Amino acid sequence: IRALKKEKTLGLSFAGTKDNIVGMAVAAGTKGYYFPVINFITKDLLTGFADELAASCKTMYVPDAKQFLHYMTDHKPQGVDAFYHQSLRDVSIGAYLLDPLTGSYPIEKIAGTYASKELPSYQDLFGKTVLEMASMQPSFDAYVCHQAAAALFCGPVIEKQLEEEDMSALYK
């Protein structure tokens, strides 16, 4: 955990439903770390950790800032701090700015477009299994880590293309 706080750029992905977090993945460099909600690792501990990481890194790429901010608002009911606006980058918003006619921007599609990586979707891996049950399967941690890694690797590519299109001010 201390090592992650020293990273300048991170990818982070929460796994959860609207009201529940089952885990969180953080990507740094070529490594991914998955933290499940289990035993002493609680939702509050994970959101607190995400809060610390957002404060300590220069840039944090996430697949879905709306989900991230929803969980963080639950963690900080008094309001989300302004530093999120400095460090947080939503790759789905960046992908939308570059190609607004696509319609939907799941991280699997973004990874294929901006990193030439094929990621399986939740449906591909777990079918109609509810999230809480899927999170107990051995492949779930890799699934969430791949989402965080995709955000980390696609983020700079998207930012570069936005700069080339003179749209980076819209993204940041």
Report the location of each language-model feature.
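Conserved RNase H-like, two-metal-ion catalytic cores of nucleic-acid enzymes
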Residues: 1-113
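Aromatic side chains
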Residues: 33-34, 96, 114, 122, ...
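Mixed-charge, glycine-rich, non-catalytic linkers/tails in nucleic-acid processing enzymes
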Residues: 81, 120-172
